Amino acid sequence: MTALRPLSGRSRSLRCSSEKMEGTGSWDVLEWTKLDSASWSGSYSNLDCLLESERIIFEACGVILINTDEAGTLLLSNFRILFLSEGTRKLVPLGTIPFVAIEKFNKLAPKVQSNKYHNNENAPTRLLQVTGKDMRIVVYGFRPGTKQRHTVVDTLLRCNKPERVWDLYAFTCGPSQFGNTNPKERLLNEYFRLLGKSSQRASMNMIEDGSFTLSNDLWRITNLNSNYDLCQSYPFALMVPKSISDEELLQTSTFRARCRLPVISWCHPGSGAVIARSSQPLVGLMMNMRSNSDEKLVASFCTQLAGHKGARRKLYIVDARPRKNALANGAKGGGSESSSNYLQSEIVFLGIDNIHAMRESFSRLRDYLDMHGTTSSDGTSSFLRHGGWTWGGGNLSSMSASVSVLGDSGWLSHIQSILAGVAWIAARVAMESASVLVHCSDGWDRTTQLVSLACLLLDPYYRTFSGFQALVEKDWLSFGHPFSDRVGMPNVSESGNFELPIQSSSARSFPSSPVRQSPGSAAAQSSSSSYGLNNYSPIFLQWLDCISQLMRMYPSAFEFSPTFLVDFIDCLLSCRFGNFLCNSEKERQQCGISETCGCIWAYLADLRSSSGTSHVHCNPFYDPSRYDGPLLPPAAALAPTLWPQFHLRWACPVEPNVTETEDQCRAMTVKYSEMKKEKEEAERKVDELSSAMESLNEELLNERDISRAARESAKRATKERAVISRAVQSLGCKVKFTRNGDCTVEVEDGPQKCSHSIPQKQSEDNTTDVSESISSVTEQNVCEAVCPLRTREGTCRWPDAGCARIGNQFLGLKTNFEAFDNLCVYDSYFTAE
């Protein structure tokens, strides 16, 4: 390998001109040097943009992104092309694309030499056009006189087309932090929900021993296909009418293409109506082949109407194909049902075209957007095309021509046909309580689109994140939509070998991009590469486009946003995760996808967990209470428009962002959330202050009670002291009180004059005594005061004798003052007997 130069070997002039190129990114400022080093220094190993297990394998300096005329460095990793801007050293999203997301790539030479490079020997004459499956057409310009382009093309040929499915990056990266759980368990849990058995949870033991065959009054789950012997493209568990035996199911499978017999995809929890799916019946060229078991199975969908005794519901058999295509399939043994053979049935043809028409339409739409966008792959602005300056680039005739090209692509017409068919199916189920059987040819493309969209309209659960995952895994993955064929990945054959899709020349496949090639030009004769174009078709992308149209009509009905759908399809096309590898559940089980690859659902959930409901994947207008039932859009509202978040993100990246309203609403939601948190914090502080105030009030009340009790106790003590004082006075005692609580009582012998000295104010000195002296003047006075021997008339009973109570009591009494605190003395103690 040559012409791949390590970063350390760049010329000084290129590094010095980086500041100048930041604003222009022009070819004029590049100094072209020949790259003669084939080694790579590994200087990009610490790039922040690299994913887990992603490593750089090649580097090409001085590459120009023709779409935006921006200079930079093109890197090739084991997963994708990366384009780093020379000025900012950041990834340029337009020039960064995973290998398997590339539909084709061509070597090109410019048709007309621009005046800008007319006399420049370093003009961009080595061009590589890369056409993506995500609507982008990118052109890289390489240095003349080098083998940069040759080396990049050679690397793309090897990395873009892995020989085996496990050579994909999904296996290199492994499950990592986005580990997968068993998808079979999730399918059974969804079946349980439909049967009204949500309390049951699936487990591996249940799957291994086959004990998942639950049922309700009308429907049951069968394990007849647990080993994929009944139908290799169907899931291991099927939901069928309870009245049909497994033997009858086996007989029915032989009458349907690829053994895809009619089974239930969704059932109404109230009315009992169902949406069933299958492939076309094998009625033959003369439309005269019949199957009693098939007719019985289909008739079992016409259960009795609730509230109508004996009346059975109507059955609509919806053939997604145009009638002429259904008749043409009769030559191959296929065809369509006859209403005369199926009980209470009506056959309806929706006229939706096949995968080849969708592929061509998608290609024409991509070319239209590249031609009339602001980042055309030929480097010319649409405003300057045809020499004009008006809208669309040119005069009135070019304006009308551009509108005509959009209409001629047919993409929006196909979207409208699908939406009209889905709305019709949903209305029959919701308004008539009718059952609907949907099929096309094989029953895995148009059938899957119609059935899953009808479920989305009828069941609000599928309009949530978890419900959307359940819907995709049930109707797209489990029922065998061939993702490997439709997306363009290595296939797994029945024998276990790996095969690559047949290459097809880009000149025969799609109309050319705006770098217009003419017969005989260098571009037309250059090499090209494409990936499985025979079976490639954007069926799943078209389904997501239909959902975006419904989200535009019902902006409050979906929990997820259009940005979520864009990131979802990007993850799918990149094959970074293993969920959508292979063509069927059986093949994914054989390859051990769930154990060895990362899970797209875990990755998307991890993105949302960082920001909660303010994440760009969350719809800020979501109101589940407003749309808690079926969505039945009228026919007049089914006029589709371009999906701006997906269709215009590469063609018109600098135009006004169509999600500005969502972004503003999301910012307001974040601000509201912050203010709500601040309010909650303020309320918490108010509650704390209120609690503190209540606590203080309680303490104040307690203090008040204590103070009241103390005052009452003091009053009682004062009263007791007064009583004691009177008692002591009656005894003619001299009492001496001290602050330490001691009290000395002395009783004098002779009658003395009674005197009562009130103690002075206590001094601050703790040793100051408080004394009280009491003496009697006469015995008569004492007797008159307190003697209990006085008669009622006031005379002493023994007037001639000396008072025996004076002089002989409390002699030498020494007491502790604290004893008085515990002494309760009442006036009644001293009343006369």
Curated annotation (Swiss-Prot):
This is Phosphatidylinositol-3-phosphatase myotubularin-2. Residues 42-109 form the GRAM domain. It comes from Arabidopsis thaliana (Mouse-ear cress). GO terms for biological process: intracellular signal transduction; lipid metabolic process. GO terms for molecular function: phosphatidylinositol-3,5-bisphosphate 3-phosphatase activity; phosphatidylinositol-3-phosphate phosphatase activity; phosphoprotein phosphatase activity. The active site is at C440 (phosphocysteine intermediate). Mostly expressed in flowers and roots, and, to a lower extent, in siliques and leaves. It holds the Pfam family Myotub-related. One of its GO terms (cellular component) is cytoplasm. PROSITE patterns: PPASE_MYOTUBULARIN, TYR_PHOSPHATASE_1. Residues 503-530, 753-772 are annotated as: Disordered. Residues 504-530 have a biased composition (Low complexity).
